[in-house]
């Protein structure tokens, strides 16, 4: 990853506010997280490389596109798994792996456990 992308989309700002709201119940939180994940995935996938391919339509042969590389999703266990839905739904046959990390509460350093 070359840079941090700050998503300025109005819905992402709204959804983030809803996630931060202590009055959001579990169902609302989960649904809001799913919606935010679609926005994030759209931005993240905007740099996926494509290659041209031919496809036969019912009328004629035409040009189209195929994704060049397999998409591998690696959410960090606990926090990252809640954002998985939008990324999985938008990608064609993604591979899903996991990394487990928690933060040391005293040093604030990440510690891998899986």
Task: Outline where the language-model segments fall.
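PRPP-associated nucleotide enzymes
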Residues: 1-114
